[in-house]
Each structure stands twice: as structure tokens, then as C-alpha cells.
Amino acid sequence: MKSEDVKLGIERAPHRSLLRALGLNTESFQKPFIGIVNSFTEVVPGHIHLRRISEAVKEGINAAGGVGFEFNTIAVCDGIAMNHAGMKYSLPSREIIANTVEIMAMAHAFDGLVFIPNCDKVVPGMLMAACRLNIPSIFVSGGPMLAGRLRKNDQVSCVDLNSVFEAVGQVAKGQMTEEELLELEKVACPGCGSCAGMFTANTMNCLTEALGMALPGNGTIPAVDSRRTQLAKDTGRQILKLIKDNTCPKDIITPDAIYNAFSLDVALGGSTNSVLHVMAVAHEAGADFSLEEINRVSDTTPNLCKLRPSGPYHIENLDQAGGIGSVLKELKPWLKNDARTVSGKTIGQMADAAPKADNKVIRFASNPYSPKGGLAILFGNLAPSGSVVKRSAVAPEMMVHRGPARIFDSEELATKAIMGGKIIPGDVLVIRYEGPKGGPGMREMLTPTSLLAGMGLDKEVALITDGRFSGATRGAAMGHVSPEAAARGPIAALQDGDMINIDIHNYKLSVELSDEEIQKRLANVPAFKPKITSGYLKYYTENVTSASTGAVFKD
């Protein structure tokens, strides 16, 4: 066992003395040492309850004959960080999370790790750490929040955080009063858990099942459900089996597992952020996977779910309909069914054991919402290295669009223009210098897209950015445009009035300019000056790579 580095031999007497100070005894030194990577914090609703999950994990570890050691890492709430300087730190926190786990695991010689994430950057940050360390590891998330209930005119509707973001646009347009907004604000987030729709956090928690790194139910069992506690206990027991068999993350997260994750992703209509994160996980796992391959997956995999923000259902409905296992059951003809999982079963065996889909929340594969999946990677002279769109959340009339560019060099300027009624039907908003380097930190443009949707413009206006979008975004929103403006990508050459062509059906994103004109304009673009020149974001700006490669650090 790796933990023998700190507990065996006379030269380790000082180490054992320190361990005894923690309450361990001689018998404890014969057992595997397991790190429990918690991301509990009182700041994030999705993480406020993770101490309870951790205690259940410890029960499972103890029952199976291990010794658990809990330690923490950071977690950012993207909703609270949204639309101010804090959002510059959200994506960069992913690398910090991976690094802190690496430091703790290597410094203390754990034999295995149980990861307890929940929200957006925590899941991929921990997956990256698991692959980097490559010691037996397993995940159990905190679970999704229940949808809120809003009573209006004797009718009760289900609402969530995205309802509040979009309501701000309705207030700005005079379609909702501030008093009505306050009532919505009070009920939209009723308790602990990751925000209730198929937003980024829940996308990543569901994909963790498809990657093979979590037990069935991880993606959908609600945070407040007693089954979540039982799942945590089972996870604690299972890590001992993984240690015994020396099953490590790189045995599980293979190119086939990445393929399965994207197959599930496009079937669910998951967040565009999943592309960024799964590519980063693949990088750490040494599992090569290209953006073009995502299109091939999406071209042949049906879209089976319309979950918020793309449709009316929440994660609790997905759970009631059979959960991720039932989606995988419908997807079995498209999966790499021999891919391994931490359960000891293959992904195909997990699918076989799941209940049949309900053909409502989870459509039968023979009756999909669309024969093509929910994500698309667009290429063209505006995005030579690619851009990402959630096509399952795009109105049919916006799948092909031609319109004049309206250029904004920051999210704040674009938001001001939208709130001021300066954007008209047909426009293509371009928000640039918001990429990994340019932001820095590749902020999410949820406020602009929510305002457009709340004002009813999401079926008439497109938005293009080298930044990111929230998983709660809907509409014709193309993000991750690469190369970014700060790297002198073509998006930096755009001027107001340039005609932009969007063809999601054919994966095209282009501007009606010749290559010569683009290069001529780029030659006159001033050299990019980093916006932040001190602290962690200075280091991040200097070391982060393109969104097309997952915005990982330089090797």
C-alpha cells in the first residue's frame, strides 16, 4: 500500500506518532488510508450539506475496513460570482482544485481517494486530479437541488435559478414588476443542492456516471433524498474494493469512456461547458479526443431529453424517470459498452440493469426529440479552432442566421446595450476579449443571454463570444470561439456591421470577409495587454491555453 510510506518501519515512528495524535492506533496502521476530498463550504448552496455526505462516506469506509481522512478544497458558486469580477476566478478555480488535491494526496500518501464535489468547476477539477494522481478513486456528488414552486393566480409552476436570471430581463422590458421578481427570488432556490436544471454542475455529475467514475444514481438523486446518503455509504465501501483490485482512474477514463460521456452529454442536451471540462479531463488521462470527434458523436446520437433550460423538466424528474441508467439503456447501441466503471461492471451492464425509460422525460431512442445530439462544434473563418453551441436550446428559426455584428469588448458593455434597448432583431452580438487569457478566466455570459431570453429576443438575436456560457443559457449562443481575441484570433478583426453567417446544421460560423481582409485588420489590432497584472490571474493569463484544448495549463 502507498500509505506504507508513512506508517511502516522504525524510521516512520515520528509519522506514526503524529497519526496517533489524530486518534489512530496500532490496528489502524494495518488498514488502507483513504483521503476524503470534500468541497464543503457555507458559501455555495450546492455544497452546504456536504459534511453529511462525508460522514456517510466515512461510515462506508470504516465498515469495509479502511481509515478515512477528510480534507477540503475550494468551491466557487458561479451564480453568486456571475456578472462581476468574481466570475474571472471561476474557471481558474478548476486548476487550483486539481492542484490542491494533488498536493494533499502526495504529501500524505493515501492509498485511495473518495471525491465529494457538486458544482460547476469542482467536478472537473477533481476528475483532473484523479487522473493526474492515478490512484484508486471514486466520486459521490452532493446531488441536485429540487425545483422551486411559485404560486401565481392559484397556479403553481416549477422554477429555478435561471427563472430569476431571465426575469430580470422581463422586468427591464416592463413585463414583470419588481414585486413579482422578489416573490420569484424567494422561492426559486428552495434548499441545498446543485441548481435544479441540466446546467453545468448537473451535467458534469451525470457525465461522471458515464465516465465510469461514480456509482449509479450519482447524477440525479436529489440532495435531500435519503438515497443520496446511502449512495455515499456505498461509495465509501466501494473504494476498498478498488484499492484491493488496484483499479485506477486511467484504467477507467479511456477514449471509450470519453466517447460515452459525450454520447450521454448530447443525448441529455448538457451544458456547453462540458466540452471544456471533459477535454481537460481527457488531457489529464492521456485519452486523446478531438473537437471534430464530438461532432461525429453528436451527428449519430439522438437527443432524448429536454431538461431546463431546453425544456420543462428538472433533474428530479429525470431521476424519477429512471436516471442516467435509463438514458444509457436507450443509448446502448451508440455506446462503447465494454468500458469499465468503478462499480466493477461495464457501462453496458449498468445500462442493462437500469429500468426502461418513460418516453416522456427520457424519450425512447426510436422517438427522439432529434436524431442528432444536443451539442455542436462550429468551425469557419471566424472560429478556425472551433466554437461550441447547445443546439438543443436553439430555436428552430435561429439554426441558420445571417445578421450584422454588434461588437462589444466586455460583458459589461454588452449588458448595458441590451438593458438600454440598443439591440434589435437580427443583430449578432459579439462579446470578445472574454476568453481564457482575455477575460482573464473566460467568464460566463449568462446575464446577456438571460436578458435576451427574458426580453423575447432569443429567437431573433444571436450571441457569439470567446467567453463561455452558463449551462442555464438558452438561445443561439456560440461560445469558446477559438483562437480568442487576446490571441489575435479572427474575432478580434470584427467591426460593427460585418455580416455574420451561422449555420448550425452544417457546423459553420463565418464572417463575410476575405482571408486577406481579416489578416489586414488583425495587423492593425493593438497588442493585447493583460487586464490583471498581479496575483493568481496574472499567472493564469500567462499559462492558460486555448478553449479548444480545454483551457488547461501549458505542459
From Swiss-Prot:
Positions of [2Fe-2S] cluster binding: 119, 195
Top-level taxonomic group: Bacteria
InterPro entries documented for this protein: Dihydro-acid_dehy_C, DihydroxyA_deHydtase, DiOHA_6PGluconate_deHydtase_CS, ILV_EDD_C, ILV_EDD_N, IlvD/EDD_N
Enzyme class, spelled out: lyase
Residues with N6-carboxylysine modification: 121
Catalytic activity: (2R)-2,3-dihydroxy-3-methylbutanoate = 3-methyl-2-oxobutanoate + H2O; (2R,3R)-2,3-dihydroxy-3-methylpentanoate = (S)-3-methyl-2-oxopentanoate + H2O
GO cellular component: a single term: cytosol
Cofactor(s) it depends on: [2Fe-2S] cluster; Mg(2+)
GO molecular function: 2 iron, 2 sulfur cluster binding; dihydroxy-acid dehydratase activity; magnesium ion binding
Short name of one Pfam family: ILV_EDD_C
Binding annotation for Mg(2+): 78, 120-121, 444
Bound cofactor: record note: Binds 1 [2Fe-2S] cluster per subunit. This cluster acts as a Lewis acid cofactor.
Gene3D superfamilies attached to this UniProt entry: IlvD/EDD C-terminal domain-like
Pathway(s) served: Amino-acid biosynthesis; L-isoleucine biosynthesis; L-isoleucine from 2-oxobutanoate: step 3/4; Amino-acid biosynthesis; L-valine biosynthesis; L-valine from pyruvate: step 3/4
Function in brief: Functions in the biosynthesis of branched-chain amino acids. Catalyzes the dehydration of (2R,3R)-2,3-dihydroxy-3-methylpentanoate (2,3-dihydroxy-3-methylvalerate) into 2-oxo-3-methylpentanoate (2-oxo-3-methylvalerate) and of (2R)-2,3-dihydroxy-3-methylbutanoate (2,3-dihydroxyisovalerate) into 2-oxo-3-methylbutanoate (2-oxoisovalerate), the penultimate precursor to L-isoleucine and L-valine, respectively.
Subunit (UniProt): Homodimer.
Similarity field: Belongs to the IlvD/Edd family.
Stated name of the protein: Dihydroxy-acid dehydratase
Species of provenance: Dehalococcoides mccartyi (strain ATCC BAA-2266 / KCTC 15142 / 195)
